[in-house]
Amino acid sequence: QEEFFKAAFAVMGHVAKAKGQVTKEEIQLASAMMDRMNLHGEQRRAAQDAFREGKDSDFPLEDVLVRVKISTAGRFDLLQFFLELQISAAFADGSIHPSERNVLHKIARGLDFSSEQLERRLQMQEAAFRFQSQGGFHGQHQGQSSGGSWQQASQADQLADAYKILDVSSDADSKTVKRAYRKLMNEHHPDKLMAKGLPPEMMNVAKEKSQEIQNAYDLIKKVKGFK
């Protein structure tokens, strides 16, 4: 667990450095990630040290990824969580720089994910970023009284993003949507990830991810009238 934890922040530092200089915003983003994990004292210092190590020009990315695979016993769910953590950190400013994308492809390869699998996860994360910034499903209830046409456009955009979060096409039937939802929830269930060795500090991030999947599914069900 400690190996996984340190590697996660070191690789985050490496991704942040991909654009050249690590900006103040990226350091704030790393701090925000530490806040999401409720890291304080010694744990926070360990995360900060790891992030700094990742910024070194001679950071041994491939070696670190090999250690991550060993520490997780190659468990798909944990490796996916690790990759998605890097994607969400890279997306925290709203977009992905080409050099960040290149590093993410290296990370994906090192964890035995194909380029196609990475690109799909990038699309899912981009949709999730927009979905959350617009308030997700729960924001829908609050905006219904203001501006009907804006609301329709906003809901159409959110619905499109909800389908992307579940990685299904917008004409998918209720069975297909439910199957995709169950698969993603099974892979991202916080308790299952913990049982497989996810560091407890990362439980909050896992909960946020599963809530995101739940919100996307709830919106599709509501708009499409799926049971």
Predicted regions and their residues:
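Small-residue-enriched hydrophobic alpha-helices in membranes
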Residues: 1-14, 24-188, 194-227
